[in-house]
């Protein structure tokens, strides 16, 4: 993650926007040497907002933990198995 002074961002905003769109890295913008803002791509913001919405859903965190435990224990059906079940009909 890059840390860039506000004055530099002001002068090269278009370049920094292109950089975060391409790399999906965050840029911390400082004012008087202290973090003041963070520049991220619109796609990354949408992803963060979607994740927060899921985590706000009652029971979602527990369901995710249970699902990960099931996968780790081998309790899952692969895409190929599902495809074979439905194409065999």
Curated annotation (Swiss-Prot):
SUPFAM superfamilies, A to Z: YefM-like
A biological process from GO: regulation of DNA-templated transcription
Domain of life: Bacteria
InterPro entries assigned to the protein according to its UniProt record, in alphabetical order: Antitoxin_Phd/YefM, phD/YefM_antitoxin, YefM-like_sf
Single GO molecular function: sequence-specific DNA binding
Annotated disulfide bonds: none
Induction summary: Expressed in log phase cells. A member of the relBE operon.
Keywords: DNA-binding, Repressor, Toxin-antitoxin system, Transcription, Transcription regulation
NCBIfam families documented for this protein: phd_fam (TIGR01552)
Subunit composition and interactions: Interacts with toxin RelE, which neutralizes its toxicity. Also interacts with toxins RelG and RelK in vitro, in M.smegmatis coexpression with non-cognate toxins neutralizes the toxicity of RelG while increasing the toxicity of RelK.
Miscellaneous information on this protein: Was identified as a high-confidence drug target.
Function: Antitoxin component of a type II toxin-antitoxin (TA) system. Upon expression in M.smegmatis neutralizes the effect of toxin RelE. Induces its own promoter, in combination with RelE represses its own promoter. Binds DNA in complex with toxin RelE but not alone.
Protein family membership: Belongs to the phD/YefM antitoxin family.
Name the record gives this protein: Antitoxin RelB
């Amino acid at each position: 993650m890059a840390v860039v002074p506000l004055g530099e961002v002001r002068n090269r905003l278009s370049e920094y926007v292109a950089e975060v769109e391409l790399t999906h890295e965050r840029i911390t913008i400082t004012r008087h040497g202290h973090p003041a803002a963070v520049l991220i791509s619109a796609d990354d913001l949408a992803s963060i907002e979607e994740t927060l919405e899921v985590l706000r859903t009652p029971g979602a965190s527990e369901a995710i933990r249970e699902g990960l435990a099931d996968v780790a224990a081998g309790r899952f059906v692969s895409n190929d198995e599902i495809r074979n079940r439905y194409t065999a009909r």
